[in-house]
Amino acid sequence: MTPEEVVERYSQVISRASHVTYVPIVPSRAENALVWDIEGRAYIDFLADAAVQNVGHNNPRVVEAVKKTADRLLHFTFIYGFPVEPLLLAEKLREIAPLEGAKVAFGLSGSDANDGAIKFARAYTGRRSIIGYLRSYYGSTYGAMSVTGLDFEVRSKVGQLSDVHFIPFPNCYRCPFGKEPGKCRMECVSFLKEKFEGEVHAEGTAALIAEAIQGDAGMVVPPENYFKKLKRILDEHGILLVVDEVQSGLGRTGKWFAIEHFGVEPEIITLAKPLGGGLPISAIVGRGEIMDSLPPLGHAFTMSGNPVASAAALAVIEEIEEKELLKRAQILGERAKRRLEKMKKKHELIGDVRGLGLMLGVDLVKDRETKERAYDEAKKVVWRAYELGLIVAFLQGNVLRIEPPLTIEEEVLDEGLDKLEEAIEDVEEGRVPDEVIEKVQGW
């Protein structure tokens, strides 16, 4: 089969609700930061498979753990039994989590983890209201979709949970209050206070769910003191802080959890994506009394705690520890960010470079003064990068997502950045035709 044939056959049998197209890559095999398609062409993966492959594609430790476990026990549901693998994983997650006395609930995706976090928060507090963030993305299951702050079509078609409210996330490059960095009064914090004085009853609010760094909103990093100020308000009213670490967790930002950069202790953390190293597994990690607030089977799935996926996840954490990947993410992140800042000085298309560790965003603009989003140009950059052998995507229509594996070799990182700059230059110089715009869907 050719890549074109595969793409066409996808359109015949795969629901469009399950897929979004950037480029027609048809993977055949992968190793660390490299992916080969079915025609043998190699690509550098600057997405880490949508932030899944923190320890690299087909990490040998993870593959070995999967093989050894699968040889003796593919599955035994821990709803009725006590397989050892999810126990060992839960104990390890409790050890690394930045909260005291944690207990764990397992699932299959970041979406169901965030759904579960909402259930636990409501059960523990006896309250109904949930606060989410505009432009946030928490998943596609019903509860996660309901607290997602993206203005996307699905909610208008299927409805959403009641008692969900939204506030703006602090974005110092595109401030929702029209302020400039260093010249504001933290209106992003006072907005929550005003919300409680108006349409939202604070004492009826169970939780606020936040990404420590907004990922699909365009890699938005809040001011350093934002979460401390926010947490004080939440604590005053007995409102839980739920932190979605699905994309930012497990070393991506240079710490186990991105919230650790901001000096607060949440009540609940959700994990998925990189946790299984490529296998489907999620985890809700929360204070013990919160995690015991639902009755038996209140958040249970037949396949959750799967022994093979749990063994893979434990191997991921061990790899991060033994290879010192937290430190490596910091070092490589600084290296990549320096290079991207140099690109910004040369290329007017780049309006902003931001992020922590290897969770980086490059905001493409038509005009640096107006900050008008460069939607078509972003599509062209992604397509041209693909032609050059680099896998990259955009968020919010114009922010390039730079999230390679934490294990990427320095020379491969540099080569990928070279390809990215070449793609940007080709777009600026008009060497990428307009017809590619229709080929790239994105979101």
From Swiss-Prot:
Matching entries from CDD domains are given as: OAT_like
User: Matching SUPFAM superfamilies, A to Z?
Assistant: PLP-dependent transferases
Listed binding positions for pyridoxal 5'-phosphate are 110-111, 247, 302
Single GO MF descriptor: isomerase activity
The cofactors required by this protein are:
pyridoxal 5'-phosphate
Keyword Nucleotide-binding assigned to the entry: answer is no
Briefly explain the null phenotype: The disruption mutant displays growth in medium with L-leucine but cannot grow with D-leucine.
Query: Which EC class, in a word?
Result: isomerase
Q: What is its EC number?
A: 5.1.1.-, 5.1.1.2
Per its Swiss-Prot or TrEMBL record, what regulates the activity? Activity is completely abolished in the presence of hydroxylamine, a known specific pyridoxal-phosphate inhibitor.
Q: How does it assemble?
A: Homotetramer.
Q: Which NCBIfam families match?
A: LeuMetRace, PRK08360.1
- Protein name listed in UniProt: Leucine/methionine racemase
Protein's organism = Thermococcus kodakarensis (strain ATCC BAA-918 / JCM 12380 / KOD1) (Pyrococcus kodakaraensis (strain KOD1))
